[in-house]
Amino acid sequence: MKTNLWNGFIDVVKREVVPALGCTEPVSVALAAAIAVEKLNGTVEKITALVSPNLMKNGMGVGVPGTGMVGLPIAAAVGAIAGEANAQLEVLKNITPEDVAHAKILIDAGNVHVGVADVNNILYAKVTVTSGDEFVAVTIADSHTHVMAIEENGITTYIAEPANTATSVKKTSPFEGALLEDIYDFALNAPLEEICFIEHAAELNDALSEEGLTGKYGLQIGATFQRNVDRGLLSGGLLTDVLRRTAAASDARMDGAMKPAMSNSGSGNQGIAATMPVVVVADFLKVDKEKTIRALMLSHLTAIYIKSHQNKLSALCGATTASMGAVAGMTWLLGGDLNKINNAICSMIGDIAGIICDGAKTSCAMKVSSSAGSAVKSALMALDGIYVTGNEGIVADNADASIRNLSALANGSMTQTDVQILDIMVNK
């Protein structure tokens, strides 16, 4: 076992698995606005946000918590008026109806402008707040909370190194020389007291799932499953429970519920996808606390490992790759070993590779539930010795190589897909 990797694994999970209130792309805009206002003398009169095409795509149609509205203008406005900068991805946790009303007044008066920035950064937001002749601009780039620069009245008062330069990644990546086998060994053998923090993911995302099951949010996918179980059109059981509880959390998340998700790799839906299927299987099997914690760690770290091969935002749906983390945790809980997990991930790549990301919105919950369903299917197949082999499509002879192939697709030809998606979205 490569125990020398373990501290790095713990650090990356603590960094990438964090609470987030609301979809993280509009929240990053709200955070930039909140930071800017802290340095502004006077009342905010005007807000301008310039964002990368990918951030625009993911912010156009998603609910902003506590506002009853969707999109980047309300995120920028309410972040400026009432955001708590030190709360990071929970920047909007204490907004009030009065704050939202104030934000709407700014928007209705034409004082909030959002546009696309001509930048190479995949994740980028520059928010400028103005009061009279004074202005403050805050730039967040490369990750959802990484402040790249602060400018006050034309003077740059802070500048940071990019969060994902080649040198910084090489220095900080815990996955140098790591394989899926090393993640498996870590999750199963690391001291429990060093990884038990991951249990908080189950607590937050299960609470979000319960909120979604009330049927008040989005497309009500989780609640739809529940209603049809009650009607007798669907049976209960493991598959239905995974779909129901996982989709419900995403329903609530994407329609602006005032409950945080535990995110993964900067995404609440990815955190939900990596958490809820594992929680449901653990509940179904009535396993003990330690086994649940180890399965959650296996899931979340595998999801981060897969995502580390890809751009932070891309045309490839992140719920699909996060669910490949979930299949690792589920397969292990159901009695599978590393070989079975390997095969299950390969089957998922053979099943759902290439599902596009066309922005954050309520219908993301459908992709989350589809990915969770693929995870259940692939886990059960693997336990019976059935899987997609390296003779088929982009799937290789092992999960590590298959992940690299999937990521080559995401980082290569799908970059043009991303351009086409945004063009369709802004011109339809």
UniProtKB/Swiss-Prot annotation:
<dbReference type="GO" id="GO:0019450">
    <property type="term" value="P:L-cysteine catabolic process to pyruvate"/>
</dbReference>
<dbReference type="Pfam" id="PF03313">
    <property type="entry name" value="SDH_alpha"/>
</dbReference>
<protein>
    <recommendedName>
        <fullName>UPF0597 protein PBPRB0240</fullName>
    </recommendedName>
</protein>
<dbReference type="InterPro" id="IPR005130">
    <property type="entry name" value="Ser_deHydtase-like_asu"/>
</dbReference>
<comment type="similarity">
    <text>Belongs to the UPF0597 family.</text>
</comment>
<dbReference type="GO" id="GO:0080146">
    <property type="term" value="F:L-cysteine desulfhydrase activity"/>
</dbReference>
<dbReference type="InterPro" id="IPR021144">
    <property type="entry name" value="UPF0597"/>
</dbReference>
